[in-house]
Amino acid sequence: MAAKDVKFSGDARQRMLRGVDILADAVKVTLGPKGRNVVIERSFGAPRITKDGVTVAKEIELEDRFENMGAQMVREVASKTNDLAGDGTTTATVLAQAIVREGAKAVAAGMNPMDLKRGIDIAVAAVVKDIGKRAKAVASSAEVAQVGTISSNGDASIGKMIAQAMQKVGNDGVITVEENKSLETDVDIVEGMKFDRGYLSPYFVTNAEKMAAELDDAYILLHEKKLTGLQALLPVLEAVVKSGKPLLIVAEDVEGEALAALVVNRLRGGLKVAAVKAPGFGDRRKAMLEDIAILTSGQLISDELGMKLENVTLNMLGRAKKVLIDKENTTIVNGAGKKKDIEARVGQIRARIEETTSDYDREKLQERLAKLAGGVAVIRVGGATEIEVKEKKDRVEDALNATRAAVEEGIVPGGGTALLRARKAVGRINNDNSDVQAGINIVLKALEAPIRQIAENAGVEGSIVVGKILENKTETFGFDAQKEEYVDMVAKGIIDPAKVVRTALQDASSIAGLLVTTEAMVAELPKDEPPAMPAGGGGMGGMGGMGF
């Protein structure tokens, strides 16, 4: 076991704080409409330019192991917020830095870290409740567009596109973001179906960066039972190889010899193939396989119908223009199914929804209906260079996540205003324990951090902005950093999803609370690398005595 280096109390916290500051300072320059870009070196290809907080955070590794631990904890804040809300990662990082800084000062002044943590938790709970009360449901497509515009850094065309896509496929519809070959960014509504089953083996992946399998103009084999043996599969595999098209296999499961053969064929390049488990269970699985069959103009290979796998021909397989498979989901886009068949199936499902008395069954039938009738919206991001396209795609994905969050939990005034106004709720809390009260005050001060940073990135003094906003009693009054003026944020369309604001604060306080209560840090000592062997073969001279 390698020797360890251990740091305690003040020394540990100081090093950790240095790491937190390095990461947070790199991330927070991207906050707000006048946030700057960060350029990230790539080991190959052109550098990446981004304004996405979590992308910057994920790239940072520090040489000092103790500083790196602090940085990685804050990176976790950005990642967690991104996973839960899909946006707000920079806000979460700024909040975490503010709480850790003030917390470290309080601990250095001799306060009890556990009481401070309790105070932080009490204050955060009050803010979350306050944000919930302020949140207003998204009522119109215009509000969806406003959220998208703010999250994409003030790009109204992106906001409009997302609102248009959501209108077409519904709030629960599937919207994906792709890179466009041309200069234009456009939205395309495609008939399609998405279900929650990913690839059975990572060896099916065709796009290593996204860890996804992408099959164009694919055949689709739908099988009701498990596939274990290879023999029955061979005729259909040979027919598909001759056609030169990729193949998607959807079955109850694919394992053993069958899965091994598919993986080997995929790796050798003989057959572009992917296999996924069928969605659902029992009778519902069979119904969903039939839905896919109708959508792709294929046949479900079922023993009940007297069909044998070895007798399957190409015209019994479904067809789709594109199939996208990641670790958790499969999306079938532009199936070859006839419109009248799909409409008839949709009619059947609607009739069953009206007949059913079970809420659970109704919910599952509505899911199937959305998958069949909703379709998939694809936003294609274009640009003059690959770097520009990637930067814009980051912003489109942020905006899409933010609009989904807004539809889910409503909207609040943007630009850091909601958190600043929540100070009132925290200010009302009084605790007899002075250390717990100090923890509450840490959050009270941290709630100013996002709006200060937005103002500073716009070249304005943060404290003046905070003071001006707090002087005005109108709840929606805030600072428009784009135009550098004080306005009614909601009337101006500067709004944030309540879920993003709430998640950012909860994740930031959770990790910051752990950092504040840290008393010791343990890291491996760097190993001394042995000197490299000298080059050349001069050392072999002693072999002469061996009679060669």
Curated annotation (Swiss-Prot):
E.C. no: 5.6.1.7
Database matches in PROSITE patterns: CHAPERONINS_CPN60
Main localization (coarse): cytoplasm
Protein residues bound to ATP: T30, L31, G32, P33, K51, D87, G88, T89, T90, T91, G415, D496
InterPro entries named among the record's database cross-references: Chaperonin_Cpn60_CS (IPR018370), Cpn60/GroEL (IPR001844), Cpn60/GroEL/TCP-1 (IPR002423), GroEL-like_apical_dom_sf (IPR027409), GROEL-like_equatorial_sf (IPR027413), TCP-1-like_intermed_sf (IPR027410)
Domain of life of the organism encoding this protein: Bacteria
GO molecular function, one term: ATP binding
Short name of any one Pfam family annotated for the protein: Cpn60_TCP1
Reaction(s) the record says it catalyses: ATP + H2O + a folded polypeptide = ADP + phosphate + an unfolded polypeptide
Subcellular localization, as worded in the UniProt entry: Cytoplasm
GO cellular component: cytoplasm
GO terms under biological process: protein refolding
Alphabetical UniProt keywords: ATP-binding, Chaperone, Cytoplasm, Isomerase, Nucleotide-binding
Function comment: Together with its co-chaperonin GroES, plays an essential role in assisting protein folding. The GroEL-GroES system forms a nano-cage that allows encapsulation of the non-native substrate proteins and provides a physical environment optimized to promote and accelerate protein folding.
Family under the similarity heading: Belongs to the chaperonin (HSP60) family.
Description of how the protein assembles with itself and partners: Forms a cylinder of 14 subunits composed of two heptameric rings stacked back-to-back. Interacts with the co-chaperonin GroES.
PANTHER family attached to this UniProt entry: 60 KDA HEAT SHOCK PROTEIN, MITOCHONDRIAL (PTHR45633)
Name of the protein described by the UniProt record: Chaperonin GroEL 3
Organism the protein comes from: Nitrobacter winogradskyi (strain ATCC 25391 / DSM 10237 / CIP 104748 / NCIMB 11846 / Nb-255)
Phylogenetic placement of the source organism: Bacteria, Pseudomonadati, Pseudomonadota, Alphaproteobacteria, Hyphomicrobiales
